[in-house]
Amino acid sequence: MPILERFGAKINSIIGLTISSVLLCIFSSQPFLAARVLDYACSCQPEVSPKGEFRYESKHVRLPKTPAEEITIEEITDWIPQYFPGETFSPETPRQDRELRLFHISHAFLQAAWINRRDCDFHLEISPNEKKDSFRIIVEMTKEYCSERKELQTQMAAKGFILDEKLREFEQPLPVEVVGLAFQDNAGPRGSSKVNSLWEIHPAIVKIVSPRELQKIK
């Protein structure tokens, strides 16, 4: 075999082995990456103790098994704060009045999401329509809802969205429905600049719905 042919065959062999090695590394790492993603849903460890969290006991409750009241995001943003508007209230304040009621938002769009490692809650920003400049409220899924969080995070990953400690925007907002308890948070930085209400749905269960299902809801 001529020297150039032998040299070319050797180069092709090296390139083939290199590509195979790279592909092997990529595919072998995928289960690990998937495990890390799903681990946030069920095995996230809070960085702050419950005593260091604002109204921790009030946030981390189970949803009541009662019929939910239908509500819209527009109606929620019209709610008046029930705890000293504009002032700080006790971090031990128990749930009362509206915060004891279960609500259902049948029409909303998931605009942004991140994980708060302080308490491991999923922070989700939803709007009444899919416009990126639309006003939003915050919805939080607590670690008590492991399976629901895992399902949501898996659906996000399937659409190429990475859910972690960084607040990220969805290029194409996702249609969702929400059921959960009303909750008034304290004033302060809580998400993007488009969030304009102290009222949240927290805890909540959030489900991605198909555009066809959303049309039926309308």
What are these regions (language model features)?
Residues 1-11:
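N-terminal secretory signal peptides that target proteins for export/translocation
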Residues 16-29:
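Bacterial N-terminal signal peptides
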Residues 35-218:
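OB-fold and OB-like single-stranded nucleic-acid-recognition modules
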Residues 13, 26-27, 99, 172:
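Residues at the start of alpha-helices and the adjacent loop-to-helix junctions
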